[in-house]
Amino acid sequence: MNINVADLLNGNYILLLFVVLALGLCLGKLRLGSVQLGNSIGVLVVSLLLGQQHFSINTDALNLGFMLFIFCVGVEAGPNFFSIFFRDGKNYLMLALVMVGSALLIALGLGKLFGWDIGLTAGMLAGSMTSTPVLVGAGDTLRHSGIASTQLSSALDNLSLGYALTYLIGLVSLIVGARYLPKLQHQDLQTSAQQIARERGLDTDANRKVYLPVIRAYRVGPELVAWTDGKNLRELGIYRQTGCYIERIRRNGILANPDGDAVLQMGDEIALVGYPDAHARLDPSFRNGKEVFDRDLLDMRIVTEEIVVKNHNAVGRRLAQLKLTDHGCFLNRVIRSQIEMPIDDNVVLNKGDVLQVSGDARRVKTIADRIGFISIHSQVTDLLAFCAFFIIGLMIGMITFQFSNFSFGIGNAAGLLFAGIMLGFLRANHPTFGYIPQGALNMVKEFGLMVFMAGVGLSAGSGISNGLGAVGGQMLIAGLVVSLVPVVICFLFGAYVLRMNRALLFGAMMGARTCAPAMEIISDTARSNIPALGYAGTYAIANVLLTLAGTLIVIIWPGLG
């Protein structure tokens, strides 16, 4: 039996879509030196090649893909979005605005200089910034702009063409810039990271190992009684001196949970909870021949939970003010916008931050109730909330503003982005509402993006040969300029206007570009994870601003003549 593959694919949109996705994802795993192509560019290249062979796909699939993607971007940004406006993130907000705003203005200028249409210009901006949200925002605004169908088709084809031609240029140039730009300034990143570490008492090690606390029991002997010198536990400050916390005492056969007024006596058996290295550093008066193995004394349930910061008595306060160790709990990680941050006593907590805390189950529960709630370890998505806010986003996108003879609509991209932000924000405040497991959110976001990329590539593929010959050289120049010049402007603004620490500044710059590979290079150069503080500060707001930039470039373009 002979099978005509071309007819088979043309007659089955679903089969064609998944063939494009599979081939594109395989291509995306290839590396050019140290740079991996990535899923987005892999799917786009395959779809452009198949589009040249006149394969096509239903545009409804393209629309659904971009809607799912942009909605999930909003959900991820929601927990930290408003805190960047209203709290200590003003510097990060300004950096993100400078990065995105300068790129937008430069792209508009180059588009007019080279005589491109809005499709090529917006696509070049999206590719140079390696930002799919720009592409999504511009495409949606074009579809609702009311231009003639032939012009719209050409603009959408050029949009994906510009993106495809400049994406790798933007990615590679930023990675090279991240490697060499720190060497062109007077302060090296390692020194800057160490300076922040000294000021804030941080661990600068980018590969810090996280251990769980363990419990061991010791019998109080004459040396330990002499060491305490009759002081109670509060006066001794056992944790400050040893790094361990006395969780239980057995005295005269009776188990008790000690308070700060307890005084250790000869023959007491004490259960100490602490990290392994803290036990190893204990004074010999604790350890030498004094360890005991008492099933009841050691029978404690040490748990590790992820606590989401929510309550007003924790939001806006510094990490040190929580005094976790005073409550017998140990902090392992601080996570913001899915970025692990250095454990810094001076970090101001935002709503939606996640603290990974270990300790006795009852104590961890008490701490969680005080500062927020324990993250739900569920694999079930609240589909009702997901669908309801998706509908709200579509309805917001239908709103149109009229100014004399000029009108513009909010569009699906901005509407869904806003609805997603609200769902993420409400989820951070109400633990039982709108829960979406991170794995499920990542899957929907990635799948939506890949479907969108497949659609735009198949639509634009037929004209790529002509377009490449006409504007290829111009695209190379424009891509480099739009990728690197805003980074330099952002550096000068952060270094000499905001006077930011260089390690934090370079992390924030990579966050404003939403480029994780470049962030890894900055962390390696600094030999520290301290730049992650800056990356997390700009990442959430940059995703939103980039989507709006895609909308704005289409709205502004006709007014430039």
UniProtKB/Swiss-Prot annotation:
**Spans through the membrane:** 8-28, 32-52, 66-86, 94-114, 158-178, 383-403, 406-426, 447-467, 475-495, 540-560
Main location per the UniProt record: membrane
Keywords, comma-separated and alphabetical: Cell membrane, Membrane, Repeat, Transmembrane, Transmembrane helix, Transport
What is the protein's membrane topology class? Multi-pass membrane protein
Q: Which NCBIfam families match?
A: PRK04972.1, YidE_YbjL_dupl
Which family does the entry's similarity section mention? Belongs to the AAE transporter (TC 2.A.81) family. YbjL subfamily.
Q: What is this protein called?
A: Putative transport protein YbjL
Q: Which gene encodes it?
A: ybjL
